[in-house]
């Protein structure tokens, strides 16, 4: 089960990179809602989405943690999360899976819609 993954942290700029060993600490134990971006690092369309996602999170006054998982480096973790295509974004709150989006967002407003849903669900838990 995902909750049994042990701890360690790797930071890259203000974005966090989850590894098999850091997933529990970065995602499941976070006090903030977490947006997990799963992608292979070489895949250009997801780099554009990552920039848009980062900007949308900034607009939300850093209400969220943004965590990236490199599909190629962390294949077993991606497999646990049942990732089958890219880009895939997953929202977590209080260690619980809330929502998954696979494929590109049509616009920044759709990214904000996704974030609003996660934020609303997170507030219900507190």
Curated annotation (Swiss-Prot):
Ranges for domain Thioredoxin: 14-120
Recite the UniProt keywords alphabetically.
Answer: Mitochondrion, Transit peptide
Give the protein family: Belongs to the thioredoxin family.
Pfam families documented for this protein: Thioredoxin (PF00085)
Where on the tree of life does the source sit, at the highest rank? Eukaryota
**Where is this protein found?**
Mitochondrion
- What GO terms fall under cellular component here? cytoplasm; mitochondrion
Q: Which InterPro entries match?
A: Thioredoxin-like_sf, Thioredoxin_domain
Q: What is this protein called?
A: Thioredoxin domain-containing protein, mitochondrial
Question: Which residues belong to the signal peptide in this entry?
Answer: none
The residues forming a coiled coil are none
Q: One MF term from GO for this chain?
A: protein-disulfide reductase activity
């Amino acid at each position: 089960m995902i909750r049994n993954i042990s701890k360690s942290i790797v930071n890259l700029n203000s974005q966090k990179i989850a590894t098999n060993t850091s997933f529990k600490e970065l995602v499941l134990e976070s006090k903030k809602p977490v947006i997990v971006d799963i992608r292979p690092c070489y895949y250009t369309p997801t780099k554009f989405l990552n920039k848009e996602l980062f900007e949308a999170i900034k607009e939300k006054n850093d209400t969220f943690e943004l965590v990236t998982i490199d599909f190629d480096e962390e294949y077993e973790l991606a497999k646990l999360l049942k990732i089958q295509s890219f880009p895939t974004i997953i929202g977590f709150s209080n260690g619980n899976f809330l929502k998954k989006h696979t494929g590109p967002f049509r616009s920044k407003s759709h990214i904000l819609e996704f974030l609003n849903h996660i934020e609303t669900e997170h507030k219900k838990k507190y």
